């Protein structure tokens, strides 16, 4: 069988088939742990990002220009503090570069989508990271 199957009460359920929750959209996401340079001794400045995402295997009836995901970069000053600044950018399959301005001791990346019928696969996003001083 191509997909996992389960039974209960004389019914057979076909799991993990399709891109939605039985016809309803659901939030899918992946999130990194905090990333720093030089063991967090130095602040970083994030200037731009090249997203690497594919929307292959999305439902066929979706316009290719509307398939999207939200890339959120979050910065924090200290490990025990929450993230204080966020830069969120909508990324389409045609997006080549996102400009942003974030600084902190560490940062994290979250990619999410809430659209119905959209399937995405994350590659290796590239972020322009520069060492920056504390202000």
Predicted feature locations:
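Beta-sheet repeat architectures centered on beta-propellers
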Residues: 1-135
């Amino acid at each position: 069988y191509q997909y996992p199957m389960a039974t209960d009460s004389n019914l057979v359920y076909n799991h993990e088939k399709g891109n939605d929750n039985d016809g309803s959209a659901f939030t899918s996401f992946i999130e990194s742990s905090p990333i720093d340079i030089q063991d967090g001794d130095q602040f970083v400045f994030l200037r731009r990002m090249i997203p690497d995402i594919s929307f292959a295997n999305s439902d066929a009836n979706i316009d290719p220009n509307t398939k999207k995901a939200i890339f959120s970069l979050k910065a924090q000053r200290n490990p025990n503090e929450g993230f204080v600044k966020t830069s969120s950018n909508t990324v389409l399959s045609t997006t080549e570069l996102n400009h942003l301005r974030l600084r902190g001791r560490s940062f994290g990346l979250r990619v999410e989508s809430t659209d119905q019928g959209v399937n995405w696969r994350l590659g290796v996003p590239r972020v322009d990271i520069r060492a920056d001083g504390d202000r």
